Amino acid sequence: MFGLFVQRHAEAAALYNNISVVYVHPDDNIHDKYEFVNDISCRDAIHRVSTIRIYYKKSKSKIINLYRFFRANKLAIKRLPKPDIIHVHVLTRLGLIAWWQKIVHGTPYIITEHWSRYLPGNDFSGFLRKWLTKMVVKNASAVTTVTDILAQAMQNHGLQNNNYIIVPNVVNINMFKPIEHHNSIPKIVHVSCFENKSKNITGLIDALCILENKNIDYQCVFIGDGIDFEMVKDYSKKLKHQGNIRFTGVLEGQDLVDELATGDFMVLSSNYETQGVVLLEAFACGLPVVSTNVGGIPEIVNESNGILVPPQDPEKLADAMQTMLQTYQNYNANTLRNSIIKKFSNESVGKLLNDIYKNL
């Protein structure tokens, strides 16, 4: 999932800069230790981003894998012209590479962090990991996070830098846009990666059961796939829903937009979130939202565009959905969409990144 967020930032930055991306990943199936799939000459004409993809042969040894990871990045970087700036997404290993490039070649680097591991209740531990992360963050020219709460959480862990900047995730406003529709039964949409520990999808199903027991009409579409997909489906069957819940699996492109934009509102029941990009995509489609009040979500959801509820409280989640089923038509789709265009579009985020680069 992080790869998608990185890709969108790279595409936004490429509106104003020449951007090259280095992508390194293990692969069990390659024959050589390292394999280049795309080279610098292979340029994506649509998104104006040059990409070097290098795969390294996966070993049973963690130490060998770590060595091959760093070696693969070194090989990829050698194929690039000397960069003016290195932009690291997601710590800590890649940050070590950028720090080394700064020490050896004097190349400044900035960090963008998306990861919720710094938020309360998550796992950011280990003396060596924390010390290395502190050093990488300290020596960066800037640190950007997608929400203010993530920046605060990082600093609470002692990750200090004098130049923290909020740079939100990108929403493809040309793809996610309203579709005129008239549902005979109100349609609720949930989109997630089906990882129940963070997304609490079973908690959402519990809340939907409460609505069903009150004889409230609704249909709910679950979009996505993940490690707990089958478990969640089985959980829904166990509770004997009366056919008003539908699982689509993964949807992409226009198929995703068609399902999302023909909804009446979105619901997210997460236990923790860094930002909740699917909520932004819902706003771009003109949908209000019901969401748990966790992580960076209160920075984007308020009474003008949705309803916030405490996490892990099916009763209050059900009450909020019941309220939204009665009031979703009061929200103006264009107003919801315009709030996203102003701050989260490719152009807006790209300009913000360009300003950061120019000021280094």
PLM region spans:
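N-terminal subdomain of nucleotide-sugar transferases
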Residues: M1-I40, D44
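Carbohydrate-associated surface elements
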Residues: I149, V170
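Conserved donor-binding/catalytic core segment of Leloir-type glycosyltransferases
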Residues: E180-K199, I205-L208, V221
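Nucleotide-activated donor-binding/catalytic signature segment of Leloir-type glycosyltransferases, i.e.
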Residues: K233-L251
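Aromatic "clamp/platform" in nucleotide-sugar-dependent glycosyltransferases that forms part
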Residues: N271
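Short hydrophobic beta-strand element within catalytic cores of glycosyltransferases
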Residues: P288-S291
